[in-house]
Amino acid sequence: MNAPLNIAALRHPSDTALSRHAIDNRHLDALEEEAIFILREVAGAFERPALLFSSGKDSCVVLHLAEKAFKRRLNEATINSASADGSRATAPRFAGRLPFPLVHVDTGHNFPEVIAFRDERIAQMGERLVIGHLEDSMRRGTVRLAHPLESRNGHQTVTLLETIEEHRFDCLIGGARRDEEKARAKERIFSHRDAFGQWQPKEQRPELWSLFNTRIKPGEHFRAFPISNWTELDVWLYIEREGIELPSIYYAHEREVVRRKGLLVPVTEVTPPQADDEVERLQVRFRTVGDMTCTCPVESPAQTASDIVTETLQVTVSERGATRMDDRTSEASMERRKKEGYF
């Protein structure tokens, strides 16, 4: 799966008229089956699991997989009749409820488009959403900022652990993937966290085939990553195949940005331009979505999932390497944060 991509080998004779990139995506069935198995394992092994939902593309994929794992899919006629305005995008595609709530840590610095999408998606599904507010942690004094515009991304670990403790969650399902970053590459699918919420890389449990050790002591919990074995290309192929809705900022749009250290920094109320910055209005999209203070877009004309698949086949820089300022503080910045309890 992580071997060098052989485009010719992926082409299928009957696919040439199906899409612009004509990539054979039949391997997605195996990835989907594995992810659904992991989700059902979580539901069966833990008493109080929850699904982390940031409205990012990976969590949207995991949420879609969870619906496939635990809900009944509606037929086409029911989907069309359930849509009030005739748009399939507003109609639910599954009936039933998930066996766990959704969780979002809101830093207060999220992109407005992402929060609007989150609220619309939750309302459409009728699921329970638990929101941990970083500003509540600030009021409690457990989070203290050096200045009002400081990045809150690293501080959300505190709010996450407080939310876990308050609701007594014993497993959080996340959308992390091994191809994103080297610290995530060595993390297990079922990632054990100690009573302090910390990850100990040297104490990871063996995972033999589909056998997982999910035993925990009081106060401990797990993080489970159903799409750990997926790549960015797999995610976009699956989004295209399944017609998964995403926040609009994942697709090309015009936005004011400034150039800093090789990155395009979006101009927002929490990332204003500095005196020597030259503000440009470019056509961009976001490859990954996080805090406004640390997430950068890339120049792109891609308007659809198919366009993004074509782009992804050609990129040479990882999505986090090209877009995240928080990963550039040191070589081990992600591992350090994960040891402290980060996602």
Question: What feature does the model see in each segment?
Answer:
Residues 2-343:
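Nucleotide-activated chemistry modules centered on ATP-dependent adenylation/adenylyltransferase
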